[in-house]
């Protein structure tokens, strides 16, 4: 029986991180968590490309464009959408999630979804290094696991 596990990646990889500036109190912490996880996994700084965009609505397009450059192996999209008093929150959440899912499913490389969608700022901060962990860090770890699985799948040929 052949079993494919998310083992540590055995080849050098380059990672792109697309991070939204909006709610930067949260997104800077998500970014720091992702960068720390990548460094701890042995990814050198020069193999990490950070691209900043205005907000969550810009994440899908820039993530897709970055994935098509051929210079990176995977992308982490980071953002934070905090519910306000209008329906804007709902539309931003739906569209950014759908766009990133499309980029992941139809693009040439894996895309990790690291957009927090919370009812309030406390919930967002808790998931950006607080008691809820750091979702940026978790996305980086997940990306490395997916890259490992994809590497193993390509070796089945």
UniProtKB/Swiss-Prot annotation:
Domain of life: Bacteria
Keyword Transferase (UniProt): yes
Disulfide bond residue pairs: none
GO CC terms, sorted: cytosol; riboflavin synthase complex
Pathway(s) per entry: Cofactor biosynthesis; riboflavin biosynthesis; riboflavin from 2-hydroxy-3-oxobutyl phosphate and 5-amino-6-(D-ribitylamino)uracil: step 1/2
GO biological process, one term: riboflavin biosynthetic process
Entry annotation: catalytic residues: 88 (proton donor)
EC code(s) of this entry: 2.5.1.78
Reactions listed under catalytic activity: (2S)-2-hydroxy-3-oxobutyl phosphate + 5-amino-6-(D-ribitylamino)uracil = 6,7-dimethyl-8-(1-D-ribityl)lumazine + phosphate + 2 H2O + H(+)
CDD domains, sorted: Lumazine_synthase-I
Record-listed 5-amino-6-(D-ribitylamino)uracil binding positions: 22, 56-58, 80-82, 113
This protein's record includes keyword Transferase: yes
UniProt-listed SUPFAM superfamilies: Lumazine synthase
Annotated (2S)-2-hydroxy-3-oxobutyl phosphate binding sites: 85-86, 127
Keywords from the named record: Riboflavin biosynthesis, Transferase
Gene Ontology MF annotations: 6,7-dimethyl-8-ribityllumazine synthase activity
InterPro entries in UniProt: LS, LS/RS, LS/RS_sf
Task of the protein: Catalyzes the formation of 6,7-dimethyl-8-ribityllumazine by condensation of 5-amino-6-(D-ribitylamino)uracil with 3,4-dihydroxy-2-butanone 4-phosphate. This is the penultimate step in the biosynthesis of riboflavin.
Protein name: 6,7-dimethyl-8-ribityllumazine synthase
Protein's organism: Levilactobacillus brevis (strain ATCC 367 / BCRC 12310 / CIP 105137 / JCM 1170 / LMG 11437 / NCIMB 947 / NCTC 947) (Lactobacillus brevis)
């Amino acid at each position: 029986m052949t079993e494919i596990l998310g083992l540590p990646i055995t080849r050098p990889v380059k990672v792109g991180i697309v991070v939204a500036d909006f709610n930067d109190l949260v997104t800077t912490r998500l970014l720091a968590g992702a960068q720390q996880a990548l460094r701890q996994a042995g990814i050198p700084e020069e193999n990490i490309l950070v691209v900043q965009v205005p907000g969550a609505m810009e994440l899908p397009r820039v993530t897709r464009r970055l994935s098509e450059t051929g210079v990176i192996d995977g992308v982490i999209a980071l953002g934070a959408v905090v519910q306000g008093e209008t329906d804007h929150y709902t539309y931003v959440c739906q569209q950014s999630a759908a766009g990133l899912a499309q980029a992941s499913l139809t693009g040439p490389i894996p895309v990790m979804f690291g957009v927090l969608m919370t009812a309030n700022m406390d919930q967002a901060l808790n998931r950006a290094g607080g008691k809820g962990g750091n979702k940026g860090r978790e996305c980086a770890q997940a990306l490395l696991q997916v890259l490992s699985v994809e590497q193993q799948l390509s070796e089945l040929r």
